[in-house]
């Protein structure tokens, strides 16, 4: 099926700028966002997760994969998600996959999903809170679904439009994925950056080969569901691995694109 008018608009915006911001229910009208919110909030209620949140709020720096102590991952380092979960229904919905596949120009793989609570911390930006770009593939679509309202103080996702690999602004700043501090700010003043504040239910599509950062709240917290869509050439899919486990029968997915998305090389 051809993309709808709004889907085609998102694809075009991604091609031109590398980023598009919409409301989830405008793209996937049948999804009940409150069901996704309720599921996500329930994941935060375990004693271990609550203890970790309190630890960070009290100034602690608990051990974390990659050193990102400020991110609470209630699903663990390798998330396990039910195929029937409402959030997977959205992530593997035909409208979202039409957008992703339309942008990538091929069927895509769902390489990773995760639930992040970014807790407010003092001090300068660290790790992915700094400007960077993702090297895993020549084009990568990440979606960030805001599960709570996100304002300037909650660590909104930030992007430099046009710096994605296919975009009009070549990536010539530094040799590495993390430029030196201040380089991006000097080259791209605030007027050339996009700060993605938004209400709960906001869905950010972005090609993260472009410069981006986020997730450093100075007050409150940022709660998002993140999904990563790539080609077969991305790490770790090229090695026959995926960064999450899907619980349930893949055969229950009706869409060929959805079944392909959760498969691996050789399936």
Question: Where do the protein language model's features map onto the residues?
Answer:
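Conserved double-stranded beta-helix
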Residues: 165-267
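A structural signal for short, well-ordered beta-strand segments
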Residues: 113-115, 143-145, 225-229
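Active-site donor-binding loop signature of nucleotide-sugar glycosyltransferases
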Residues: 24-26, 162, 227-229
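Glycine-rich nucleotide phosphate-binding loop and flanking beta-alpha elements
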Residues: 28, 137, 212
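Non-heme Fe(II)-dependent double-stranded beta-helix
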Residues: 1-16, 23-129
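Catalytic core of non-heme Fe(II) oxygenases with the double-stranded beta-helix
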Residues: 98-101, 124-195, 236-242
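A conserved hydrophobic position in a structured secondary element of the catalytic/binding core
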Residues: 92, 160, 206
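Short hydrophobic-aromatic micro-motifs
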Residues: 22, 143-145, 204-206
């Amino acid at each position: 099926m051809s993309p709808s008018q709004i889907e085609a608009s998102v694809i075009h915006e991604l091609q031109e700028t590398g980023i598009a911001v919409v409301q989830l229910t405008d793209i996937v009208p049948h999804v009940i966002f409150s069901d996704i919110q309720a599921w996500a909030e329930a994941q935060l209620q375990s004693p271990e997760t609550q203890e970790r949140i309190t630890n960070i709020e009290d100034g602690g720096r608990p051990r974390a994969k990659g050193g990102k102590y400020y991110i609470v991952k209630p699903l663990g380092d390798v998330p396990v998600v039910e195929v029937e979960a409402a959030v997977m229904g959205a992530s593997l919905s035909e409208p979202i996959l039409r957008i992703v596949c339309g942008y990538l120009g091929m069927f895509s793989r769902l390489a990773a999903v995760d639930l992040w609570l970014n807790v407010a911390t003092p001090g300068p930006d660290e790790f992915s809170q700094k400007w960077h770009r993702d090297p895993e593939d020549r084009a990568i679509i990440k979606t960030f679904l805001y599960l709570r309202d996100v304002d300037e103080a909650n660590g909104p996702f930030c992007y430099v439009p046009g710096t994605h690999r296919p975009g009009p602004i070549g990536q010539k700043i530094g040799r590495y994925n993390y430029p030196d501090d201040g380089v991006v700010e000097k080259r791209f003043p605030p007027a050339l950056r996009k700060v993605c504040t938004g209400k709960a239910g906001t869905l950010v599509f972005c090609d993260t080969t472009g410069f981006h950062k986020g997730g450093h709240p100075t007050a409150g917290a940022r709660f998002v569901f993140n999904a990563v869509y790539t080609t077969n050439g991305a790490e770790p899919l090229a090695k026959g691995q995926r960064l999450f486990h899907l619980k349930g029968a893949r055969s229950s997915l009706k869409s060929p694109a959805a079944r392909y998305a959760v498969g691996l090389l050789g399936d």
